[in-house]
């Protein structure tokens, strides 16, 4: 099988690869005949190397493959057959490739090979544009220097550069012959192609035509300006002299005509003989350029080469049209026709001496012109000596006072003498002036720097002292904050903490430089000098002036101060006296808008004073309900608004504590109060149309006052919260404040607190409601009077001042619990049954029976102040569940039955269920918290409806009696006390009372069918907790009820605040209600939303019980607050 493979490999004719042969022989023969077979193919090669002593220039180098090739080449040369075979060898690709390249190189050398370098022909240089269309604007050969440089010269650094200025030349050395060949190869090639065909002829003449064209342009179209290369042209007048240019041109003309005839007569094949003849003709003479300038010495040659680039912009035929006469150094005033003089005449015609110059300026211009003539032929660097620069600077300064036209004429005139163009001369003069002005600035800047150096040490030392003091104060403050941290957490809600942090943020001492008159004066002086040195002509806009001053101050003046001590804007402001006349043209007064944080702080302060609710999460619901609370007497509206409130609540539940959901109320406190007043007025007008009751017009001023006083007083009353309590939030406080404000507007005159028992305080406020001025108990003079004018529907009937008793049940507070959105939805669901509410009430009664020494907390709200307040003010006993302690409650004020044999007897009237079901946001909300997990906002109409309608009549017939409300709230206010809870409950009472009927009877009768707007709307009527009159003189309430079902919740103490409210202004029924509400900070999400939403969604009815009221005491660890509602109320626990 191996044989066919070998045949395939060796089938190519020619000698086989030695390696391949070796391998095959090894395999077959075993290597015995290997040497004989391989000898012919791989003959031994002897190489002789001659070594020499290496030095720094060279050392012996040998390339073995090359040596072997050379020797084998000789051998192959002896055997042409072998060579042939070697080329055909398929494995010798390198050799084949080399042969191909050599053949290709020979071919190109024959075709394009460089001929002997010929001398430049004068015709090529003078008439380069011959035959081109001079009207063609596309061709531009103005920079084709390479066509003009003599063969014996080269550029200084080799090569040609477009638009890089004047070229400098040097003699070409023999060692650079290759470079010159490469560079000069174009000329003969172009010449040959030109003679050979039209196409290349045009390419060759590209360069020269545009030179002529550009020179004509500069001469004729720009008559008012000198050529940019005017200086170069002047240099050539030195070298004009020995040769008659006219004779040369005649000779060139004859040559051209003869050449044309030859081209027409002879075929292109004859081109080479014609060219050879022309070359022989020209070779006999010296370099035409040398003959043109009349000298062949190297020195003159270099000078001529230096002047050659000026030919770029000249029309040589015109410039050389007159034969030169005289010495190349003759004076300019000589009117001869030298090359330079002709040039000067051509280009100096437009720039005549300007007239009307001041005598000093005219004198300086003539001096400069005379100096230019004396130094004629000098380069720019040599010409502009110190004296010339001084004269030019003087001319620049004087021409600044003249018009721009005269100034331009002066420089145009000077440019005709000087070795530079007008633009270059103007730039040089401006630079000299700026440099001189910069020298003027050095001294004032140094003075300013010295003054700053004298002032800085003292200020730096002062700054360091301030930094040290600041550091010490910061450390002290940190220590103090650590000590007060727990107390501050209890006192401040989240929002207040954020605001205080923002307000208290203490920045370190600033590096503020203290200016003195000396430094300010030096700064203004520096700025004035800088402005004087600025070009007034080109920078006349005020904005440009301002930018210039700012850039100067930032770049040159600001660094004079140590880093961080000065800012450019401060420098600009302090130096306004120096630049104001230029920079103030476009200056605008900047109106600095107050920062949002400051606005928020001020509005919060205003809120504290005016008692406008600013709860974090109650805001949107409150606003929604306020604006929508107008016409809610129809069942459709009442259903509509609870859903809207529900949406607002669910949306806001997930909001973080830092978000103020009541921002509108915070920013527009007056508008929110106005909205409430308008709403109450609307309710009043609607109620006036009904036969059952009339609502008096509310007054909003007292609400604001009393709210503010109440806030401050409650803060004082509960000044000492337990340190273990978590920091409360404002979320509850704001809506409660709003509600309490309304409740207090009903006529509570004053509040006072005194410590009682184990940490209990009694706040008793007595005062006739009609007067609105509180009477203080002598023993409680430390508290503020709470002036109250009658506010809302209850203000109609004066009622004796009630006593308000506040009990601190304990110091523990539960953390705020935000009910989840699904739970809120459950609370707002429309399908709660009244039996559930009754069941919850019964459970509440049972737990109350088990309670120890506290009054019954409101069953409807397991700690929800709004429910009880609403029940007390707006519901009669018939339509509310009355829970009374037999020893301490009068049943007289309660229309419904009261159970006296139980510590907490709840009279749950069917009217309540019926009334709540028709009410869009009334008593239903109170029981919703009691009703348990479902807590529907929509009440199904039941038999209780008829009872609720019947109850109002009986209630209306009763005589007006004082109404007492007992609010139970856990500790925790803005200051860590339970004042926030009291205030919140009071506000809740009022808010629920304002829109609702004055008496519970009236509210129940007037309640239209609908769903409660609050989250915790219930089917049952609002609960009048302890509706039978409660003895105000009895300071103690029944002990905390331990609810088995709510064991987790019962551990949190509640404060009990009892105060009377004139709720039965029209019905004339006095009621005592105990409202249990959590501390304002314990829950900030659900309560405020549900309260406000329910409150405003059903204005004419009892206040909605917020879902938050139920969930306030539920720890956040609980999975769902809805589990707790049906199990019993949260009651105060005796410590």
Curated annotation (Swiss-Prot):
Residues 1-38, 77-96, 171-220, 253-280, 480-503, 603-646, 747-985, 1094-1135 are annotated as: Disordered. Belongs to the ubinuclein family. The modification Phosphothreonine is found at residue 166. One of its GO terms (molecular function) is DNA binding. Residues 891-901, 937-948 have a biased composition (Polar residues). Transmembrane segments: none annotated. Signal peptide: none annotated. It is found in: Nucleus, Nucleoplasm; Nucleus, PML body; Cell junction, Tight junction. The keyword Coiled coil applies. Residues 25-38, 79-96, 194-213, 253-268, 480-493 have a biased composition (Basic and acidic residues). Expressed in bile canaliculi in liver, in bronchiolar epithelium in lung and in tubular structures of gland ducts inside the olfactory epithelium and tongue epithelium. Component of a complex that includes at least ASF1A, CABIN1, HIRA, histone H3.3 and UBN1. Interacts with HIRA (via WD repeat domain); the interaction is direct. Interacts with ASF1A, CEBPA, TJP1, TJP2 and TJP3. Keywords: Acetylation, Cell junction, Chromatin regulator, Coiled coil, DNA-binding, Nucleus, Phosphoprotein, Tight junction. This is Ubinuclein-1. GO terms for biological process: keratinocyte differentiation; nucleosome assembly. Residues 476-539 form a coiled coil. InterPro entries: HRD, UBN_middle_dom. Residues 792-804, 856-882, 905-934 have a biased composition (Low complexity). GO terms for cellular component: bicellular tight junction; centriolar satellite; nucleus; PML body. Acts as a novel regulator of senescence. Involved in the formation of senescence-associated heterochromatin foci (SAHF), which represses expression of proliferation-promoting genes. Binds to proliferation-promoting genes. May be required for replication-independent chromatin assembly. The modification N6-acetyllysine is found at residue 222. Residues 974-983 have a biased composition (Gly residues). Residues 182-193 have a biased composition (Basic residues). PANTHER family: CAPZ-INTERACTING PROTEIN AND RELATED PROTEINS (PTHR21669), UBINUCLEIN-1 (PTHR21669:SF12). The modification Phosphoserine is found at residues 173, 175, 323, 336, 338, 493, 660, 677, 1028. The gene is Ubn1.
